Swiss-Prot record:
Its main location: cytoplasm. Transmembrane segments: none annotated. This is Phosphopantetheine adenylyltransferase. It comes from Prochlorococcus marinus (strain MIT 9215). Belongs to the bacterial CoaD family. The lineage of its organism: Bacteria, Bacillati, Cyanobacteriota, Cyanophyceae, Synechococcales. Homohexamer.
Length: 157
């Protein structure tokens, strides 16, 4: 069974890492799929985000990191992944993620979406929030891994 954890990861946060570590314990392996979203202008380009993720997950040998563009369900089909993992911080996340899960299911009836609730330590955390704090010089060392912290400080210098 292949499990796909898709996202933009711009940037990767400690919340993402916690979810990946927990999923790896449950499922044994995971494919982290980094979206190249052409409708957004990311802070970090695709290659940089992949490097950040690989560096931050080097302690997890059963995690594969790939990139993709287009529909997540198409990426899952290409990988022959039948499960998509999503994290939920709040009820508002659930409403949005449920719509996406139903859409994916309508495009491929064999795809299932599994939701893991976020660790309460990271329930406030989002990539957008991290960038906002970093932009104004706030401390982000408890929000992101060290390599991402360095990259953000350099970016907003």
């Amino acid at each position: 069974m292949k499990i796909l954890y898709p996202g933009t990861f711009d940037p990767l946060t400690n919340g993402h890492i916690d979810l990946i570590e927990r999923a790896e314990k449950i499922f044994g392996n995971l494919v982290v799929a980094v979206l190249e979203n052409t409708s957004k202008t990311p802070t970090f380009n695709l290659q940089r985000r992949i490097i950040q993720i690989k560096n931050s997950l080097s302690h997890l040998p059963n995690i594969e990191v790939i990139s993709y563009s287009g529909l997540t369900v198409d990426c899952a089909n290409e990988l022959k992944a039948n499960l998509i993992l999503r994290g939920l911080r709040a009820m508002s996340d659930f409403e949005y993620e449920l719509q996406i899960a139903h859409t994916n299911k309508s495009l491929n009836n064999d795809i299932e979406t599994i939701f893991l609730s976020t660790n309460t330590n990271y329930s406030f955390l989002s990539s957008s929030l991290v960038k906002e704090v970093a932009k104004f010089g706030g401390e982000i060392n408890h929000m992101v891994p060290p390599s991402v912290e360095r990259d953000l400080k350099e970016y907003f210098k």
